[in-house]
A protein has these predicted regions:
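Loop/turn-to-beta-strand initiation segments
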Residues: 69-74, 99-105
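Conserved catalytic/switch belt of AAA+ P-loop NTPases
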Residues: 64, 89-100
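Generic recognition of short, well-ordered alpha-helical segments
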Residues: 86-90, 117
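Charged, glycine-rich active-site and insertion segments that engage polyanionic ligands
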Residues: 100-103, 109-199
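Conserved adenine-binding aromatic site and its adjacent loop/helix in ATP-hydrolyzing domains
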Residues: 61, 93, 120
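Clamp-loader machinery-focused feature within the broader ASCE/P-loop NTPase space
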Residues: 1-86
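Residues immediately C-terminal
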Residues: 82, 97, 113
Length: 199
């Protein structure tokens, strides 16, 4: 795996292997995530995540090893648009002429942001969104939503399951805040100043 990371220490080259244990746990806990979730997991406060130039050397090194089962070697690069220019340039030759039985999977949220020289060396497959009935069914069975609510959220998610999950979370937050607001209004109506201050 190759994925965007933040610099751990100034002056030290950071590579994905520095975060690989965190990455594996993160992906196993929730397979639906985006860059913001990963940044939060890494503890990146104001740092930008990138795939740094040192990573290109690591990719070359890893692909020079024999495959453990004697078959294909697969390099998955998540968000290749986050590769810095030096890293991209160092990988051009490898992408153009990969070693035998080697496959690169570049998983991108913004394919047009990938360097044109890399785009020209790849074959693009657009993955379409998940159909509304499928999202609705999962929301009902796995998350216990009522059919009407699940259908509404599935429609608003536009085929993006992560967006559907975030909508569920926002709905739960909105319910909580609404209940808190109701309690505050009741205390206000009853003129219970002491309880309002404690609230």
């Amino acid at each position: 795996f190759v994925f965007p990371v933040i610099k751990k220490k100034a002056g030290k080259d950071t590579v994905c292997d520095d975060f690989i244990a965190d990455w594996r746990n993160f992906v196993l806990q929730n397979p639906y995530f985006n860059l913001n979730h990963w940044l939060k997991e890494m503890g990146a406060e104001n740092q930008q995540a990138q795939i740094f130039v040192k990573e290109s050397d690591e990719i070359v090194r890893k692909l020079s090893l024999k495959s453990s089962q004697g078959g294909y070697k697969i390099m998955i690069i998540w968000l290749p648009e986050k590769m810095n220019v030096e890293c991209s340039n160092k990988l051009l030759k490898l992408l153009e002429e990969p070693p035998a039985m080697t496959v690169f999977l570049l998983v991108s949220e913004e394919p047009d942001a990938i360097l044109q020289t890399i785009q020209s060396r790849t074959q693009r497959f657009n993955i379409h969104g998940i159909k509304e009935p499928e999202i609705s069914k999962v929301l009902q069975t796995k998350y216990g939503l009522q059919p009407e609510d699940a259908d509404d959220i599935a429609h608003r998610s536009e085929g993006n399951f992560l967006k559907a999950l975030e909508t569920i979370h926002l709905s739960e937050e909105n319910k909580l805040f609404f209940e808190l607001f109701i309690n505050l209004m009741r205390l206000s109506y009853q003129r219970k100043i002491r309880e309002m201050r404690q609230w």
